[in-house]
UniProtKB/Swiss-Prot annotation:
The protein's name in its UniProt record: Capsular polysaccharide phosphotransferase LcbA
Family under the similarity heading: Belongs to the stealth family.
Misc note: Stealth proteins are part of a protein family that is conserved from bacteria to higher eukaryotes. Family members were first identified in microbes as proteins that help pathogens to elude the host innate immune system. Microbial stealth proteins are involved in the biosynthesis of exopolysaccharides. Stealth proteins are predicted to function as hexose-1-phosphoryltransferases.
Cleaved signal peptide residues: none
Domain of life: Bacteria
Pfam families named among the record's database cross-references: Stealth_CR1, Stealth_CR2
The entry's keywords: Exopolysaccharide synthesis, Transferase
Species whose genome carries this gene: Aeromonas hydrophila
Lineage: Bacteria, Pseudomonadati, Pseudomonadota, Gammaproteobacteria, Aeromonadales
Length: 364
């Protein structure tokens, strides 16, 4: 009877609610319906804020400016030298290195929404954002500071990420960001680390086995499968879930342990100038899962909107974020990923969309 009354009183709302229940809108990788996100986040954030954290937490970005002529020359020279059959899918695609000024907004989101961060490191290849003035809070780290020169220059994110623990003065607890990941709302340090130092493991609902069965062929999947195989062989622990495409809480000591235990495996791919299907992805899979095996990470929830920056759908996601902002129901984060330059695009202009969304969070 109540449903009948609702239908006659507000037929539009009745139909909307019926469709949302039967076909829920899902914008994240943990497969949480949009209308349930806020319930989970409110309770999670309340719990994560209860116990203060008294240790320093840093943030690390990796970044490249593909408009830099000197960098472009190095990139083109080495791109011509690689064997196309040896590198992974899209490994040399220009989209992997495209700079839409995302770092400006990602960094701004960290400064605005994570004010408790001690220091921010930006790992680059002889570059510095034109709009940024480095300081004690925000430091530029060159590839030569952390990677042996015999492996440089490198255009392989897996190689760069394998050396993050060598950043001078880096805290034991740090959060790794790609520059296409953005904090969407204020978050406590407890979202990333417990007060006893345990890291959050932001698991996705995706399955490595299913992705492989469907024929997915990317360096990321190959690196995850290889990492999972090594960990399963040594610890009899089967891992089938990648992480959500968002920031990654990490422990420097687990990086160092990875190098002690698996130096030969790690050194085997350091000479790969571009990503291949024979790499390991330390920062985004191997170290987080080894942390879990060692008891210093626990599965946690991060609701991250993940979308293709080149797709016309990007505007739809930003509209959803704006609506959520007005309602106070924003997700934890979002990732505007630049998939590949061969995809058709309606020129969603991600820079314009970011500038509108982060009107008051830009740094420079």
């Amino acid at each position: 009877m109540r449903k009948l009354k609702k239908f006659f009183k507000n037929p539009g709302i009745f139909i909307r609610d019926h469709l949302n229940k039967k076909y829920p809108v899902i914008r994240n990788e943990i497969e949480c319906a949009e209308n349930e996100e806020d319930i989970l986040m409110r309770h999670d954030l309340a719990l994560e804020s209860k116990i203060d954290i008294d240790f320093p937490i840093d943030v690390v970005f990796t970044w490249v400016d593909d408009t830099d002529p000197t960098w472009q020359l190095r990139y083109q020279q080495h791109k011509l030298q690689v064997n196309a059959e040896h590198v992974g899918r899209y490994a040399t695609d220009p989209a992997r290195f495209s700079n839409h000024d995302e770092l400006r907004y990602s960094l701004g989101s960290v400064l605005k929404f994570l004010p408790w961060v001690r220091r921010i490191y930006i790992v680059t290849d002889q570059q510095c954002p034109k709009w940024l003035t480095p300081s004690d809070k925000i430091r530029i780290v060159d590839h030569t500071d952390i990677i042996d020169r015999q492996y440089l220059p490198t255009f392989n994110s897996h190689v760069i990420e394998a050396h993050l623990h060598k950043i001078p003065d880096l805290a034991e607890h740090f959060i790794y960001f790609n520059d296409d990941v953005f904090v969407a709302r204020p978050l406590p340090a407890g979202h990333f680390f417990r007060s006893n130092g345990i890291a959050s493991l932001f698991m996705s609902n995706k399955s490595l086995a299913i992705m492989q069965k469907k024929g997915t062929d990317t360096p990321t999947l190959s690196a995850s499968l290889k990492s999972a195989s090594i960990l399963n062989q040594d610890f009899s622990f089967l891992i089938d879930h990648p992480l959500v495409h968002t920031y990654v809480p990490l422990r420097k000591s687990i990086f160092e342990e990875s190098w002690r235990l698996y130096r030969a495996d790690l050194k085997s791919f350091l000479s790969h100038r571009f990503r291949t299907n024979h790499d390991l992805n330390l920062a985004t899979f191997f170290v987080p899962w080894l942390s879990y095996i060692r008891g210093v990470a626990v599965p946690s929830r991060d609701i991250c909107y993940y979308f293709n920056a080149r797709s016309p759908a990007a505007a739809t996601y930003f509209k959803a974020l704006e609506i959520a902002k007005q309602k106070g129901t924003l997700p934890h984060s979002f990732c505007a990923n630049d998939f590949n330059s061969k995809e058709k695009t309606k020129d969603s202009n991600v820079t314009l969309l970011l500038s509108r969304y982060f009107k008051d969070a830009i740094t420079g």
